[in-house]
């Protein structure tokens, strides 16, 4: 009976793990100086997401590469963040984030644009399930800083529902204001 339950738990865990996509962003060889010399190990940076709006990143260190990747993946799954996507494919609004000397600017993009982003940011967007986004990184190109800056920006992303609740307005009122503020709205009305 207990063995059957244990097997079922393992199957559930494997099923949960299979829904996630993990991307290895960076591997670094690190050294610890000890009395007898240097002890070498590896550090891994991994991004994990379900391609439905949840994403996380993790850092793992170990003597062997596969063990470092496994630790980083587990850390990423523990720190998943939900991001509200517009139409399930892009951001609701432009947003910027920073961490250390790394700064990123994320812009919502029209359908068919694709993911225009470099290096570590691309891994985050692919794991998130985002299809259309334009991103620019400024300052530091360190993958750790870029990933953290990207997550900082994504945490600042708000859905119209969240903004309306915070302001005490209806979502339709916000969307009407957005349509009025779009460039070219006056030209379309005049025609």
UniProtKB/Swiss-Prot annotation:
This is Small ribosomal subunit protein uS5. The N-terminal domain interacts with the head of the 30S subunit; the C-terminal domain interacts with the body and contacts protein S4. The interaction surface between S4 and S5 is involved in control of translational fidelity. The keyword Ribonucleoprotein applies. It comes from the Bacteria. Belongs to the universal ribosomal protein uS5 family. With S4 and S12 plays an important role in translational accuracy. Located at the back of the 30S subunit body where it stabilizes the conformation of the head with respect to the body. GO terms for molecular function: rRNA binding; structural constituent of ribosome. InterPro entries: Ribosomal_Su5_D2-typ_SF, Ribosomal_uS5, Ribosomal_uS5_bac-type, Ribosomal_uS5_C, Ribosomal_uS5_N, Ribosomal_uS5_N_CS, Ribsml_uS5_D2-typ_fold_subgr. Residues 162-191 are annotated as: Disordered. The keyword Ribonucleoprotein applies. GO terms for cellular component: small ribosomal subunit. Residues 20-83 form the S5 DRBM domain. GO terms for biological process: translation. Part of the 30S ribosomal subunit. Contacts proteins S4 and S8. Keywords: Ribonucleoprotein, Ribosomal protein, RNA-binding, rRNA-binding.
């Amino acid at each position: 009976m207990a063995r059957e339950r244990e097997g079922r738990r393992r199957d559930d865990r494997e099923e949960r793990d299979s829904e996630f996509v993990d991307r290895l962003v960076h591997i670094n060889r690190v050294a610890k100086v000890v009395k007898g010399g240097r002890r070498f190990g590896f550090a891994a940076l991994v991004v994990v997401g379900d391609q439905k709006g949840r994403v996380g990143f993790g850092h793992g260190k170990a003597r062997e590469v596969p063990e470092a990747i496994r630790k980083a993946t587990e850390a990423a799954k523990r720190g998943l963040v939900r991001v509200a996507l517009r139409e399930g494919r892009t951001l609701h609004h432009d947003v910027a984030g920073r961490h250390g000397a790394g700064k990123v600017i994320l812009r919502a993009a029209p359908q068919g644009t694709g993911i225009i982003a470099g290096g570590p940011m691309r891994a985050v967007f692919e794991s998130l399930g985002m299809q259309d986004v334009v991103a620019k990184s400024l300052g530091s190109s360190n993958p750790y800083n870029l990933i953290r800056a990207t997550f900082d920006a994504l945490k600042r992303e708000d859905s119209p529902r969240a903004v309306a609740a915070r302001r005490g307005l209806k979502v339709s009122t916000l969307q009407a204001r957005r349509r009025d503020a779009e460039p070219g709205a006056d030209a379309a009305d005049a025609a």
